[in-house]
From Swiss-Prot:
Protein name from the UniProt record: Maternal protein exuperantia-2
Pfam families to which the protein is assigned, alphabetical: Exu_RNase_H_like, SAM_Exu
Reported impact of residue 220 to S: In strain: msh9
Coiled-coil residue spans: none
Outcome of mutating residue 221 to P: In strain: afc1, afc7, f17, m32, msh9, msh37, ps1, ps2, ps3, ps9, ps10, ps11, ps12, ps14 and ps15
Entry function: Ensures the proper localization of the mRNA of the bicoid gene to the anterior regions of the oocyte thus playing a fundamental role in the establishment of the polarity of the oocyte. May bind the bcd mRNA.
Region Disordered, annotated ranges: 196-226, 384-477
Name of the gene encoding the protein in the UniProt record: exu2
GO BP: any one term: bicoid mRNA localization
Natural source organism: Drosophila pseudoobscura pseudoobscura
RNA-binding among keywords: yes
Resulting phenotype, residue 382 to R: In strain: f17
Length: 477
């Protein structure tokens, strides 16, 4: 597959970056499949925990046992964690507290490819599959391709899947004119559900002009939405597909009164409309692979700046976020630690300033901070700038509280650290210890408490034997 990619689709820039030329998806008859994943984190080195796909003809869902554990944010987002029982690791749900059945990554990917090939086999008139995803960062296709690349399955994947289509920019284009800026999956689903419920209410009022009561069963729909956990990739895949269909149907109609849900319209017509709408926002698989390759090179350039921002990563979250932003901005423009050092050796600080002003993602004060940081790192006569962190008062209060508790035990202060409060109001030090029974005391018996009295001696003599006379009835025997 990689060898089949044309060299004209990428051109090398002066900075060493790989500029990907976007190729448009050719017109044809394709199957739309919404795909979602749950991962151990939000980095390319993380692993897939759950892989899910949804289409009008069926769905696919499989949990994957990762080699690494989920980070704290991923555990809270997906409500699953990795547990160890003896020598075995397994996934456990944090909602039901039950063990989740999972497979290895290669087995899950093979099942996913078999499912995609089965979809194409059932519809021989289709030319391929276009995968829908809703993500502003393009994280989902990169993670899927990274997993397929581990086991050399990209060629087989390319036989079925022709392109990836991102519904996030499509939603921003359609809803931007209405003043809607937040185009997250959850927000869009709520907006479209409200518009659908409002239109159904208007239709009921139009059908009952006399005011006759009409009962609509909205409780079942609400309970279904409430019971569906959006942290699961299986639920989100279905949400992506239904949201895209509803978005196209609402955009195709001019007035909200004529809104038609995808359930009432024919699925084939709705899918054709959706396919025509997502074509401008789709990207061929070859272009996505080249973008992934450039992302891996960008990560290598980011890691080269680690010595510069080492002090930033050792401080608070604010400085760590700024360090990540600076590294991404430098790496996206093709700079490395060695290339910036060559510029500094040639033109010193003015040369760095000329280069950093070309980064549009940085503000003026951020550019000045980054310039001073790089200049102090490259110049041996200067000390490297270290971020100044304001110490919060929590640690001081905690130490003072500990000191107060220690001094109160010594009886120097009263309750709450106030000398005017008597010590009788303070909490007692503890229960008086009860005297333990001493084995030696039991053996020696009561001791003489008078001063100068000799210690009691142990009684070793046995008591005198007592003669017992037999009863009279046994005397004649």
């Amino acid at each position: 597959m990689v060898s089949a990619i044309s060299e004209d689709s990428a051109s090398a820039t002066a900075s060493g970056q790989c500029e990907v030329v976007k190729e448009e998806l050719p017109a044809g008859n394709y199957i739309l499949v919404a795909v979602e994943i749950d991962t151990t984190g939000r980095r390319l080195i993380d692993e897939i925990v759950q892989l899910a796909g949804y289409t009008s003809k069926g769905n696919f869902q499989q949990y994957i046992m990762p080699y690494m554990n989920l980070n704290q944010a991923a555990r809270q987002r997906h409500q699953i964690r990795v547990i160890s029982i003896g020598f075995y690791r397994m996934l456990k749900s944090m909602q039901t507290y039950k063990i989740i059945k999972s497979k290895s990554e290669v087995a899950a990917l093979m099942d996913f490819l078999n499912w995609l090939e089965t979809l194409l086999a059932k519809q021989p008139n289709k030319e391929g599959i276009v995968m829908l995803y809703h993500d502003d960062r393009k994280f989902i296709p990169y993670m899927i391709l990274e997993a397929l690349k581990k086991y050399s399955l990209i060629d087989r994947f390319n036989r079925s899947v022709k392109a990836f289509a991102n519904t996030c920019p499509m939603a921003k284009t359609f809803l931007g004119k209405h003043g809607i800026k937040n185009c997250g999956l959850r927000k869009l689903s709520m907006l479209l559900a409200k518009s659908k419920d409002g239109n159904s209410t208007k239709e009921d009022e139009h059908e009952n002009p006399e005011g006759n009561s009409s009962i609509t069963d909205n409780s079942g729909h609400k309970n279904q939405k409430q019971g569906a956990f959006e942290g699961s990739a299986n639920v989100r895949a279905k949400m992506v597909y239904e949201m895209a269909l509803q978005l196209i149907e609402s955009e195709s109609t001019e007035s909200p009164e004529s809104f038609e849900s995808p359930e009432s319209s024919e699925s084939s017509e709705a899918e054709v409309k959706l396919l025509n709408a997502v074509r401008p926002f789709s990207q061929l698989l070859s272009s996505t692979i080249l973008e992934l390759k450039d992302q891996n090179h960008s990560l290598g350039r980011q890691n080269s700046f680690r010595p510069v921002f080492l002090n930033y990563f050792r401080t608070t979250l604010n400085y760590r976020v700024r360090a990540v932003k600076y590294r991404i901005g430098l790496a996206e423009h093709g700079f490395t630690l060695k290339s910036l050092k060559a510029i500094w050796s040639d033109k010193r600080k003015p040369g760095l300033e000329l280069v950093l002003t070309a980064i549009d993602s940085l503000k003026t004060e951020e550019t000045a901070e980054l310039l001073d940081l790089l200049d102090s790192y490259y110049d041996p006569s200067k000390t490297t700038i270290k971020p100044r962190c304001k110490r919060s008062g929590n640690g001081t209060r905690r130490r003072n509280r500990a000191k107060g508790a220690a001094s109160s035990k010594n009886g120097a202060i009263g309750a709450g650290g106030d000398n005017s409060v008597p010590d009788s109001a303070t909490k007692p030090g503890g229960r008086p210890r009860r005297k333990r029974n001493n084995i030696r005391n039991n053996i020696l018996g009561p001791q003489n408490t008078e001063k100068g009295s000799p210690k009691a001696e142990m009684k070793t003599s046995t008591p005198k034997s007592m003669s017992i006379k037999p009863p009279s009835e046994f005397a004649d025997i």
